[in-house]
Amino acid sequence: MAKVHRLMNAVLRLAAAAAAATAAVVMVTSRETTSFFGIQMEAKYSYTPSFIFFVVAYAVAAAYSLLVLAVPAGSALSRLALTTDVVLGMVLAGAVASAGAISDIAKNGNSHAGWLPVCGQIHAYCNHVMAALIAGFVALAVHFVVVMYSLHIVTDVICPCH
């Protein structure tokens, strides 16, 4: 049974790493230059702090998901990894939420603040960001499954009640 748990943990963590890396790479490659009424306008992820936070959080999540594969199951480190998984999940949720809020403002603007939507001028950039956000939500969902599975394994080791 321990081999099945290790295999399942590895598959889930590899899926989480792949989804997180995909989200980060897609966001990093989001860029578009366009001309609007004769004014050159460039949009890049690095111009928005929320998008930078998104990239850093998801890159860290991808690296962490790969590094934690080396942690032996049932060890004290596996309990620490579970705690870190929960914290990382909160960071990922914050990153995708903040990037999503900025993306929504770019798409719809904010009439109360007088901010106009910009996605009408930079379609490809906004679509690229949307793809990164979708990958981010997928990564967050997979990470949640990792946390639930790890919680099950750690509590089963502490109290094998069945």
Swiss-Prot record:
Query: Which keywords does this Swiss-Prot/TrEMBL entry list?
Result: Cell membrane, Developmental protein, Membrane, Transmembrane, Transmembrane helix
Q: Which GO terms describe its cellular component?
A: plasma membrane
Segments in the Cytoplasmic topological domain? 1-7, 72-85, 150-162
The record's tissue-specificity note reads: Mainly expressed in roots and leaf sheaths. Detected in shoot apical meristem, organ primordia, including branch root primordia, and vascular tissues.
Q: Which GO terms describe its biological process?
A: multicellular organism growth; response to auxin; response to brassinosteroid; unidimensional cell growth
- Residues spanning the membrane: 8-28, 51-71, 86-106, 129-149
User: According to its UniProt record, what is one Pfam family this protein matches?
Assistant: CASP_dom
Q: Name what induces it.
A: By brassinolide (BL) and auxin (IAA), synergistically.
User: For side Extracellular, which residue ranges?
Assistant: 29-50, 107-128
Tell me where in or outside the cell this protein is found.
Cell membrane
InterPro entries, sorted:
CASP/CASPL (IPR006459), CASP_dom (IPR006702), CASPL (IPR044173)
Similarity-based family: Belongs to the Casparian strip membrane proteins (CASP) family.
Subunit and partners? Homodimer and heterodimers.
The protein's role, per its UniProt record: Involved in cell elongation in rice through dual regulation by brassinolide and auxin.
Tell me what this protein is called: CASP-like protein BLE3
Q: Which organism is it from?
A: Oryza sativa subsp. japonica (Rice)
The organism that produces this protein has a lineage beginning with: Eukaryota, Viridiplantae, Streptophyta, Embryophyta, Tracheophyta
